[in-house]
Amino acid sequence: MIKVSHSRVSCYLSCPYSHYLRYVERLSKKGKSRPLSFGSDFHKLLELRGDKSKLKSGFDAIKNTYYDLSPQNQVDLGDSYLDDLKTIFNDYQKVYRNHELPDKTEMKFDIEMGKYHGESVVFTGIIDELYETENGLIIGEHKTFTRRPDMLFIVMNTQKCLYAKAVQFLTGSL
């Protein structure tokens, strides 16, 4: 089975050789980069935001994982990693405190697109949030950035378009 994700396509468009090393040769870096780690940890906290005790336990688990890393990986993430994560997540909660929680989080999907040389090609991904409304479904997608992205980046983001098509395919509505 050939799995195609938004990340895989983005990697190929950014650098075909990097795509080859990562997805064909299956080589990976020894440790996750700060942006990837930060995004993963932020999403873990998002899933727990409706329950304060689970949120505290989740943050404690992230902290324990950080301190279990090798010294070099801790240096790569930075001394302020845990403080930055907590500060940014607390700011997020203040901004969205009056918003309702999503009906579904971390919705995984695999959609068969066809075959290539007899092998199935599957579009795969994880949708951060789904909100069910009277007028259909709303997709929530969270990204963490070092700098605030400009509107062109936000409008031209293909991930939300692909995920909208996936939701439409899976549910019959959007």
Where are these regions (language model features)?
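Metal-dependent nuclease catalytic regions and adjoining charged, substrate-binding loops involved
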Residues: 4, 63, 67, 71, ...
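Short helix-capping/linker segments at secondary-structure and domain boundaries
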Residues: 28, 49-57, 169-173
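A non-catalytic, helix-rich entry segment at domain boundaries
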Residues: 41-115
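Short amphipathic alpha-helical segments and their helix-coil junctions
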Residues: 1, 16-29, 69-70, 139, ...
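Short acidic, Pro/Gly- and aromatic-enriched capping/linker segments at domain boundaries
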Residues: 1-9
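Mg2+/Mn2+-dependent nuclease catalytic core
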Residues: 107-174
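Nuclease catalytic cores
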Residues: 9-52, 106-107
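Hydrophobic (often cysteine-bearing) scaffold residues that line and stabilize catalytic clefts
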Residues: 34, 38, 81, 85, ...
